[in-house]
């Protein structure tokens, strides 16, 4: 059968194409060793395997909210999954425009809590995602170490955070869980972009997620109360559901 494709923009970590193949619509991604950034930002392209595996596990746990995995080309670091509908909007864009749908918020935090619960203290998950090298390259180095390079007085605090995050794992951490990686179509959501997945501490997902909401209170002060209220409700829901820690 014939196929056609369009390249997608917006990401820094790889080449992405929207592929039309018969009755299927796919997103196909190929990882880059040097990310598309002004400064040097290197990362092993084998992270596509991690993205494929994390996407697969998320789809097994919350299939209603995560696209299906179609294939993985190990030799060329290419990963293919079902595409979210083209009618989707990015949740981040909705929030920045003042559209606050608390049903979407519930689905987002409920999905995260289910994955954290299901994958907690799981030897198979630890086997697949136990190597935190990619997490270091994609999060610790560009976020924490880069900041310390500009503000050396933060070194002691940063070292304690690094030790905590790089220490013993508890569950499957998404690593990039934020409104920019959750697409919305009506009240259906699609959770995407799993390449920072690792067996780590769930506090990272909560902090990363919360940070995006707190930044929106600065960006759009007129909706700050609504933003913090939504975040509080989501965190309360998360902590009411987690079963693997006090």
Model-derived features with residue positions:
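Helical subdomain adjoining the active site within ATP-dependent kinase catalytic cores
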Residues: 142-143, 243-246
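Generic beta-structure capping elements
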Residues: 31, 83-84, 194, 209-212
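Active-site catalytic-loop/activation-segment of kinase and kinase-like phosphoryl-transfer enzymes
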Residues: 82, 114-164
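Active-site activation/catalytic loop segments of kinase-like enzymes and analogous catalytic loops
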Residues: 53, 204-243
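ATP-binding pocket architecture of kinase catalytic cores
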Residues: 8, 18-123
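Active-site acidic catalytic loop and adjacent metal/ATP-binding pocket
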Residues: 6-21, 26-28, 160-204
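Juxta-kinase regulatory segment immediately upstream of eukaryotic protein kinase catalytic domains
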Residues: 1-5
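Conserved protein kinase catalytic core
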Residues: 35, 88, 182, 199-201, ...
